[in-house]
Each structure stands twice: as C-alpha cells, then as structure tokens.
Design a protein with these regions (language model features):
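Conserved acyl-donor/pantetheine-binding loop and adjacent beta-alpha core of acyl/acetyltransferases
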Residues: 39-76, 84, 135-138
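Short amphipathic alpha-helix that is part of the acyltransferase structural core
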Residues: 1-45
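Short acidic/polar active-site loop segments enriched in Thr and Asp
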Residues: 106
Length: 150
C-alpha cells in the first residue's frame, strides 16, 4: 500500500478496505505508472455519492445535499513523493475527471488537504466550501470542495 504512507495514520486504509471501496459498483479508479520502470506514480479514485453516504463519518453532512445528484465522491488523488512537483498530479487529476465525466457524472465532490491538494482542485474550477480544521483528528485542515463538470 505505497500510497497510504502519504497520509496521516488516521486516514490510511487497509488493503481490504481499499479493495472493498474500489469494488463498489460505479467506482472509478485510475493509476499512473512510470513507463520505463513500470513503477507506480499516482492514483485517483472515487465512488458514486450514494455509496459515499453509506459511511457515517466526518464530513458526511457536507455530502447530504448532493444525495440525489449525479455526483462522484473522490477519496484520493495522490502522487508518490519522488514524483511530486512535476505536474503529474495535474495530469492524473485531468484524466480522472475525464473518466468521471465520460461516465455521466455532473459533479465531483471531495475533501482535500488545504492548501496544496485544494489548490489543485481549484485550478480545475472547484469551489471550496466547508472547512474542517482537525480532519479525522489529524490536526490537518481539509476543505470540502465541489467541482461542476462541463
């Protein structure tokens, strides 16, 4: 689970949890690989809003108004540290957004670490809404965002 190391322990998923999430009907996940070494570079994944609302976790109140929308909740867009600051997060995010739009979704929703990850979403047109200053007791500020797809 190479990507889990990027996150606070309170936010890390077990392999079983991640497999369950990615096995949800309608989940959309993409991975980026280094073509020369075939090493993983990044991942992005999300599930339909109805599936995200099955959890009773922090931030779910942000999602309630969207329960009947064609919305995808993005759990993660992550680039391994050695590949960060090279524009690859933007490429990965763009591809994931394209796949989600192609599947017929109208909205992307998520909670992203502020300011870095939130800035990536804002660069694609996301609006930052609610702020969560101690997301899952990590001491980190996360912002809820909404991104309308064209």
């Amino acid at each position: 689970m190479v990507f889990e190391r990027l996150f606070h322990p309170n936010l890390q998923m077990t392999l079983t949890e991640k497999r369950e999430l990615l096995g949800v009907r309608g989940a959309i996940a993409v991975w980026m690989f280094n073509p020369a070494s075939r090493a993983l570079i990044g991942e992005a994944y999300g599930v339909p809003i109805a599936e995200a609302l099955r959890d009773d976790d922090e931030g779910m109140a942000d999602l309630q108004p969207y329960r009947r929308s064609r919305a995808m909740y993005v759990y993660s867009t992550a680039i391994l540290r050695r590949y960060q600051r090279q524009g690859l997060g933007r490429v990965l995010k763009a591809y994931h957004l394209g796949r989600v739009a192609q599947a017929g979704y109208q909205l992307i929703l998520g909670h992203a670490r502020c300011p870095d990850s939130s800035a990536l979403n804002v660069s694609f047109g996301a609006k930052l809404l609610a702020r969560h200053p101690n997301w899952y007791e990590t001491g980190e500020l996360y912002c809820f965002y909404e991104l309308r797809l064209q």
